[in-house]
């Protein structure tokens, strides 16, 4: 089957499936990004989460946090207050963990060059743990992610191990991370619009030269945040310089799995 036709079939199948996430719909903060990507023939989103504060309870015999085997005590895509967590903790009989998870977005791309465009946008927007994977059937997936998270145990075997004052302190950190995550999402959307507009203009004018130039420029990037000058403003550049908890490198991996 022709590669374009096969990708089109994959996209139609994915977008026609029901949303089996807990929320059952796309998070408000990423709706525009998802719509923009799915409106382009070379992309479609397979999963997304705009970022959330969650309180999980795991079994008393479990050594690792595994969300599929946990009880979700609290889930919020907005800033939380201490009382929300205290009330939720009263339902815990095992080990409760407070977490903040930043944006995660998975996009299947028609070809590697398309994924490279999105990867540059993600890096420039502060999602510096983003990466590309290529499956054995040629499925190219771009994951937008960062290490801007938080995970702290609060109780053990139903007993609260920290003070309410410390919970309030943790929530201030989590809420701050939530606000920073939202700013990164906004930067990502703005950069994505610019990148796709530039791509459309270049494709319509010099399609063959565009592909060759795009591949060369991607390979030569040593500092993607400064190389992609169409996306990074002076203000954004200062913000990105302070993102000490993110890996500044490019992650492009090829795995022999199928996606």
Swiss-Prot record:
**Keyword S-adenosyl-L-methionine listed:** yes
Kind of enzyme, top EC level?
transferase
Give the record's keywords alphabetically: Methyltransferase, S-adenosyl-L-methionine, Transferase, tRNA processing
What SUPFAM superfamilies does the database record attribute to this sequence? SSo0622-like
Q: What does this protein do?
A: Probable S-adenosyl-L-methionine-dependent methyltransferase that acts as a component of the wybutosine biosynthesis pathway. Wybutosine is a hyper modified guanosine with a tricyclic base found at the 3'-position adjacent to the anticodon of eukaryotic phenylalanine tRNA.
Substrates-to-products reaction catalysed:
4-demethyl-7-[(3S)-3-amino-3-carboxypropyl]wyosine(37) in tRNA(Phe) + S-adenosyl-L-methionine = 7-[(3S)-3-amino-3-carboxypropyl]wyosine(37) in tRNA(Phe) + S-adenosyl-L-homocysteine + H(+)
Pathway given for this chain reads: tRNA modification; wybutosine-tRNA(Phe) biosynthesis
GO BP terms, alphabetized: tRNA methylation; wybutosine biosynthetic process
Is Plastid tagged as a keyword?
Answer: no
Against InterPro entries, the record matches this protein to:
tRNA_yW-synthesising (IPR003827), tRNA_yW-synthesising-like_sf (IPR036602)
- Identify the domain of life: Eukaryota
Q: Where is the composition biased (Basic and acidic residues)?
A: 200-216, 226-241
Q: Report a single Gene Ontology molecular function.
A: tRNA methyltransferase activity
The text of the family note is: Belongs to the TYW3 family.
**Entry EC no(s):** 2.1.1.282
Region of interest (Disordered), ranges: 200-259
GO CC terms in record = cytoplasm
- Tell me what this protein is called: tRNA wybutosine-synthesizing protein 3 homolog
Q: Which organism is it from?
A: Sus scrofa
Query: One short Pfam family name for this protein?
Result: TYW3
